[in-house]
Amino acid sequence: ATNAKVLKPYHLPYNPLALTQPRVFKPLLPIHVANTFNDTLSRVYHLGPKQSSTLLNCIKSAYVSRGIIPNDPKTWTLPAPTFQNVYSLYMGDDDIKKGDSQEAALRTLADFEVFEADSRNTESLFDLLTGVVVIDISGYDTDLQNLIIAITLDLFYAQMQARGSSKLLGKHRQLTKMILVDEADNFLHEGFPSLKKILKEGREFGVGTILSTQFLKHFGSGDDDFSKYILTWVVHNVAD
């Protein structure tokens, strides 16, 4: 009835390393994007400081291999590297110790071919989300599910900021996108920053968020109390 477009986490047609230029110039944009991707993957798979630093260097090298220089904005419009480029650099560097949790994490993303490997076959996530779009991650490992959601929200937040504020008509603001995270309890306790930022700032950009879960206590998971960012509640039947 909704004519939804259903995407499986296989060759997802958006690039988490894409460079989206914000309206307010941000120096060293490739470094910011690299740091966000690195932080998210490190958080999901609990990578140590040394592992995280190694991954960050691989991401930065991937940008340079595509001719993208962090301090040269004129190069930022070149096609960005994909995760597959990063993985190839990582596996091809004999100085990097393999056989640890970092390699396992990267190999999982590579083996499942979650993201499209050719940047020419990718598009803006914000443009992709036209009509009803479902990313069906059921049946995948929990860590991989969390990683896909977190990376997608990271990219969505960056592109939301770049698009700028939505239109105002009197006191009413245009609604441009609505995000629904089903079974959100699996994700909330991880404390990913992009979700909180979208909840706090999304109104200005016409972006709404629906978090669906079975217990009220899930909204207070971890160090964050997500309930304070929610203005509308729909309660059907909860055990707590």
Feature map (PLM): residue ranges:
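Conserved ATP-driven motor cores of ASCE-family P-loop NTPases powering translocation/secretion/packaging/pilus
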Residues: 196-240
